Amino acid sequence: MAKIKKGDQVIVIAGKEKGKQGTVLSVSEDRVKVEGLNLVKKHQKPNRVTGAEGGIVTQEASLHISNVAVFNATTQKADRVGYQVDENGAKTRVYKSNGESVAVAK
């Protein structure tokens, strides 16, 4: 189970984009797309049905989920995420380093 969710603030910990930060746009099985990182150029054909123009389009490619970590804004470092059950029985995501709850992505 991936502990990184859409909307999380992450930092890249390995690869050519190491040290850069961004917001998660999407999460699949073991890959994540991060806003503004791992940009690739795609040659796109024009499509009359959708109205898409042809040409060279720059877009985000996915990164492996093991190469990113959730960014803890209070410590300004990469952190791990765990789950904690509160007294009401609700599960909340917390940082492993300091036990603070992870901000809910909007």
Curated annotation (Swiss-Prot):
Keywords on record: Ribonucleoprotein, Ribosomal protein, RNA-binding, rRNA-binding
KW Ligase (keyword) present: no
Any GO BP: translation
Entry-linked Gene3D superfamilies: 2.30.30.30
Any coiled-coil regions, as ranges: none
Disulfide bonds: none
GO CC annotation, single: ribosome
Keyword RNA-binding included in the entry's annotation: yes
Family membership: Belongs to the universal ribosomal protein uL24 family.
Protein name as it appears in the record: Large ribosomal subunit protein uL24
Protein's organism: Acinetobacter baylyi (strain ATCC 33305 / BD413 / ADP1)
